[in-house]
From Swiss-Prot:
<dbReference type="Pfam" id="PF17864">
    <property type="entry name" value="AAA_lid_4"/>
</dbReference>
<feature type="region of interest" description="Large ATPase domain (RuvB-L)">
    <location>
        <begin position="4"/>
        <end position="184"/>
    </location>
</feature>
<feature type="binding site">
    <location>
        <position position="174"/>
    </location>
    <ligand>
        <name>ATP</name>
    </ligand>
</feature>
<feature type="binding site">
    <location>
        <position position="69"/>
    </location>
    <ligand>
        <name>ATP</name>
    </ligand>
</feature>
<dbReference type="Pfam" id="PF05491">
    <property type="entry name" value="RuvB_C"/>
</dbReference>
<keyword id="KW-0234">DNA repair</keyword>
<feature type="region of interest" description="Small ATPAse domain (RuvB-S)">
    <location>
        <begin position="185"/>
        <end position="255"/>
    </location>
</feature>
<feature type="binding site">
    <location>
        <position position="69"/>
    </location>
    <ligand>
        <name>Mg(2+)</name>
    </ligand>
</feature>
<keyword id="KW-0067">ATP-binding</keyword>
<keyword id="KW-0547">Nucleotide-binding</keyword>
<comment type="function">
    <text>The RuvA-RuvB-RuvC complex processes Holliday junction (HJ) DNA during genetic recombination and DNA repair, while the RuvA-RuvB complex plays an important role in the rescue of blocked DNA replication forks via replication fork reversal (RFR). RuvA specifically binds to HJ cruciform DNA, conferring on it an open structure. The RuvB hexamer acts as an ATP-dependent pump, pulling dsDNA into and through the RuvAB complex. RuvB forms 2 homohexamers on either side of HJ DNA bound by 1 or 2 RuvA tetramers; 4 subunits per hexamer contact DNA at a time.</text>
</comment>
<dbReference type="GO" id="GO:0006310">
    <property type="term" value="P:DNA recombination"/>
</dbReference>
<dbReference type="InterPro" id="IPR036388">
    <property type="entry name" value="WH-like_DNA-bd_sf"/>
</dbReference>
<dbReference type="GO" id="GO:0006281">
    <property type="term" value="P:DNA repair"/>
</dbReference>
<feature type="binding site">
    <location>
        <position position="65"/>
    </location>
    <ligand>
        <name>ATP</name>
    </ligand>
</feature>
<feature type="binding site">
    <location>
        <position position="221"/>
    </location>
    <ligand>
        <name>ATP</name>
    </ligand>
</feature>
<feature type="binding site">
    <location>
        <position position="318"/>
    </location>
    <ligand>
        <name>DNA</name>
    </ligand>
</feature>
């Protein structure tokens, strides 16, 4: 099973991109949640605009689906400049990054998603570009190779990553502003769902929006996806208005429970509790019990369960917590 196959996946899906752009906020005043990040960025942006300088290079990191791309677009909009978007895996050759950099205008924003996947060769080119706005690349090979030095207009590089630990120290140290995005509160997600519903023309009661928010795993991308599915259900099974009852019925049909768990989350937890007496149990045994690959369990299923306190990862194996027992209505077994 792939992460993108799940309804509650926080990964981006190509078919949703156009709709996501339609409901994406364009200014910090519309950007719900991440209050500390918003207030800091507002000050940095205002200061840069007063000086007519480019904003310092910005690194944004955090789990997928929390709005890193949205924040990058907001920064460019607030600065009143253009944004050029690309991603780490796409930039394969020195000529690729050179073409992008030489086409930037003064104070423009270059946004690189998945920046941790840049090759070392590309990183080496970025260092002088970020520090001195100079491009130094080699053209040709062997005896015919020659170095070309170009002046670049001042610009802002915004890098986004879900895995900040994979960034090399020299690259990470060149970002003057580093922002971490956290999972959203239910109140913030409720505001996001209500705003998206309004923009999509979906009549939604406040309680209906909150019910969707409760099951969205702290992630706006999931909240907006669930909103679209609940909208479909309400139009077919109801009168098109999303009430709390309609949201509950739709999400129960979609097998997304009150904690945002789907069938695979529940299957994993129940396997640990029922098959292995709550653990500790090794990852290979869990994989065999639920018929999933070890990598899928470690990368797709476990992180949210651990983050929410339903599962513990210990040197002896995985252990279901008392919170997991309570979720399924079991009495917790005393762990040694």
């Amino acid at each position: 099973m792939l992460e993108s196959d799940r309804l509650i996946s926080s990964q981006s899906i190509v078919s949703e991109d156009a709709m996501d752009r339609a409901i994406r906020p364009l200014s910090l005043s519309e950007y719900v949640g991440q209050d500390s990040v918003s207030s800091q960025m507002q000050i940095f942006i205002n200061a840069a605009r007063k000086r007519n300088d480019p904003l310092d290079h910005v690194l944004i990191f955090g789990p997928p689906g929390l709005g890193k791309t949205t924040l990058a677009n907001i920064i460019a909009h607030e600065m009143g400049v253009n944004i050029r978007q690309t991603s780490g895996p796409v930039i394969e050759r020195a000529g690729d990054i050179a073409a992008i950099l030489t086409n930037l205008q003064q104070n423009d924003v270059l946004f690189i998603d998945e920046i941790h996947r840049l090759s070392p060769v590309i990183e080496e080119i970025l260092y002088p570009a970020m520090e001195d706005y100079k491009l130094d690349i080699m053209i040709g090979e062997g005896p015919a190779a020659r170095s070309i030095k170009l002046e670049l207009p001042p610009f802002t590089l915004i890098g986004a990553t879900t895995r900040a630990g994979l960034l090399t120290s020299p690259l990470r140290d060149r970002f003057g502003i580093v922002q971490r995005l956290e999972y959203y509160s239910v109140d913030s997600l409720t505001q996001i769902v209500a705003r998206s519903a309004h923009l999509l023309g979906v009549p939604t009661k406040p309680e209906g929006a909150r019910e969707i928010a409760l099951r969205s795993r702290g992630t706006p991308r999931i909240a907006n996806r669930l909103l679209r599915r609940v909208r479909d259900y309400s139009e077919v099974k109801g009168n098109g208005i999303i009430t709390v009852d309609m949201a509950q019925q739709a999400l129960e049909m979609l097998e997304v429970d009150q904690h945002g768990f789907d069938l695979m989350d529940r299957k994993l937890l129940l396997a640990v509790i029922e098959h292995f007496n709550g653990g500790p149990v090794g990852i290979d045994s869990i994989a065999a019990a639920i018929g999933e690959e070890k990598g899928t369990i470690e990368d797709v299923l476990e992180p949210f369960l651990i983050q929410q306190g339903f599962l513990m990862r210990t040197p002896r194996g995985r252990i279901a917590t008392s919170k997991a027992y309570q979720h399924f209505g079991f009495s917790a077994i005393e762990q040694e």
